Amino acid sequence: MLRREARLRREYLYRKAREEAQRSAQERKERLRRALEENRLIPTELRREALALQGSLEFDDAGGEGVTSHVDDEYRWAGVEDPKVMITTSRDPSSRLKMFAKELKLVFPGAQRMNRGRHEVGALVRACKANGVTDLLVVHEHRGTPVGLIVSHLPFGPTAYFTLCNVVMRHDIPDLGTMSEAKPHLITHGFSSRLGKRVSDILRYLFPVPKDDSHRVITFANQDDYISFRHHVYKKTDHRNVELTEVGPRFELKLYMIRLGTLEQEATADVEWRWHPYTNTARKRVFLSTE
C-alpha cells in the first residue's frame, strides 16, 4: 500500500513538472508573438531562442486551452461525489478553539470533527485516506483565539495555509438560534488572477453541489488579498424583495503558502506559492486578483 501511494505520488509530481515546463514555454511564445504583432523589440531574455520559438508558433492553435491538467487530477470527482471533510485542531486545544471547530463542522455539509488527542499528523492523514476523506482541515490558535487554518486536499494535495483574523463566532452572539445545514450556494468574488482561481478552487471544492431551493449562501470575497468569509440565509418577503440574515461565523483569511503535497509531507513537498512579506513591494502587491 505504501509503495503504491509513493508510486502514484511520483507519477503525479512528474505530470505536474511537465505541465509547468509546458506552461513556461507557452508564456515565452506568447510574449514573442505579442512583440512581433506590435512591432516591438524582442525581450532580451528571449532573443537567443527567438527563432526556435517562432518556428513552433506556426503549429500552435487555440485548441489546447481546455486540455486536462493536474488540477483535473486533484479534483476529478468534484461535482460528481460530495466532498468528505474532516476537521480537527492543534494539540491541547482551548475551549474556544473547540467551539470554533464545532462551528466549522456546521459550515461544511456532511463534515466530521475529530478530537486531536496525541495523534501525530502522519497518523491523521493515513486514517483520513483509509476512510475516503477528501479534505482535512486543521485549526490553530494563540491564547484562545483562532489564528490559523490549514486545508489539505487528499490523497495528493495541494495544501493551503491561511492566517485567520477578525474571528466572530456564533457562540459570542446571544439568541442566534440554530444554523441551517442545507447545502449552500457559493459566491466567490475578486479571484481573477491565476493564483486567485487556484485558491477559489481549493475553497469551493470543500462544498457539495447545492439544490436549487436552498436558502443558504456562503460568500468568499477577496479584497487586497484578504478573503472575507460570510454566511447568510435568505427568505423572500414578497415577489420582489429578499431579506438577508447573517448567521455566522465570520472571519478573514490571508493566504501565505500553498504546498503541492499533503500535510504530513511538509519537509519534502514542493512549494507552489509562498507569500514574502518582508520584500519592499509586499504591501503594494496583490496576488489573488488582477485589479
Curated annotation (Swiss-Prot):
This is U3 small nucleolar ribonucleoprotein protein IMP4. The lineage of its organism: Eukaryota, Metazoa, Chordata, Craniata, Vertebrata. Pfam families: Brix (PF04427). InterPro entries: Brix (IPR007109), IMP4/RPF1 (IPR044281). It is found in: Nucleus, Nucleolus. It comes from Homo sapiens (Human). Part of the small subunit (SSU) processome, composed of more than 70 proteins and the RNA chaperone small nucleolar RNA (snoRNA) U3. Component of a heterotrimeric complex containing IMP3, IMP4 and MPHOSPH10. Interacts with MPHOSPH10. Disulfide bonds: none annotated. Component of the 60-80S U3 small nucleolar ribonucleoprotein (U3 snoRNP). Required for the early cleavages during pre-18S ribosomal RNA processing. Part of the small subunit (SSU) processome, first precursor of the small eukaryotic ribosomal subunit. During the assembly of the SSU processome in the nucleolus, many ribosome biogenesis factors, an RNA chaperone and ribosomal proteins associate with the nascent pre-rRNA and work in concert to generate RNA folding, modifications, rearrangements and cleavage as well as targeted degradation of pre-ribosomal RNA by the RNA exosome. Residues 83-264 form the Brix domain. The keyword Cell division does not apply. The gene is IMP4. GO terms for biological process: maturation of SSU-rRNA; ribosomal small subunit biogenesis; rRNA processing. SMART domains: Brix. GO terms for cellular component: fibrillar center; Mpp10 complex; nucleolus; nucleoplasm; preribosome; small-subunit processome. PROSITE patterns: BRIX. GO terms for molecular function: rRNA primary transcript binding; snoRNA binding. It comes from the Eukaryota. Keywords: Nucleus, Ribonucleoprotein, Ribosome biogenesis, rRNA processing.
